[in-house]
Amino acid sequence: MVSDSCKKRFGKIMMEEMELVAQEEIAPRIYSMILKGEMVAQMLPGQFLHIRVPDGSKLLRRPISISEIDPETQTCRLIYRIEGGGTAIFSQLPIGSKLSVMGPQGNGFDLTDLGQGQKALIIGGGIGVPPLVQVAKQLHEQGVEVEVVVGFATKEAVILEEELSQVAHVTVTTDDGTYGTKGYVSTVIDQMDQEFDAIYSCGAPGMLKYVNTKFHDHPRAYISMESRMACGMGACYACVVHLENESQAAHKRVCEDGPVFGTGTIVM
């Protein structure tokens, strides 16, 4: 049961003052933040949080994907990159700070239909890798054989390889060849000859376009979209994506209808 620390509810979305219990820089300008609160019990792999910047001049909340979830300790791990003034403020917050958090938001990845003996492919790129960690962990717990291919610009940018390697077979690519396989995730995936029961991906638009094309007709292939947001509740339509099949509706909202969509459903 959620206590009074969750001040408001908007449908399934809650507002809570969560506590910052740990933070560290894990790569240049990329930080790992651990928050504690009762909201954690409601979180699913692939969802995100909308966090208020503790600065009166910053009006919009920042959407940050949930990387790992630990209901037992009521903590969640977020990984974010400093992109501007708001995220720079996050990186300087002292341990014990309280943050106004709205969430958990988004539909997340549906992992309930996979189990023992099945295979899943996880594809991530750059700062799109973090939300896939909990996906890999949960699939592993369900007995799924997990193959992970993640791509980064260079060796210094590689993150979360150790965490993923604990639950999956991991292949890392770098654009410049300074670590792992030289090239892109497509370099590795195009050489694979095995079939997968499900595909989960998150990353830059170019990578997601590749995944959408290659697995366009796969019945269980999913892409998680990154988008700029304003309200985070679907009211402002600032994060709209367009549908391939417009017979019913022309668009969907990343914050409310996503961020996870099936391949072959949206225009990339």
Language-model features: locations:
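Short, charged beta-turn/beta-strand-edge "cap" motif at the junction between a beta-strand
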Residues: P54-K58, G103-G108, N245
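Ferredoxin-reductase
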Residues: S5-S97
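FNR/FR-type flavoprotein reductase catalytic core
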Residues: G85-R228
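Local cysteine-cluster metal-coordination motifs and their immediate loop/turn environment
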Residues: P205-G206, E226-V260
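Structural signal for conserved beta-strand scaffold positions within catalytic alpha/beta enzyme cores
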Residues: A22, E68, V172-T174, I223-M225, ...
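A charged, well-structured terminal subsegment
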Residues: V185, H251, G262-M268
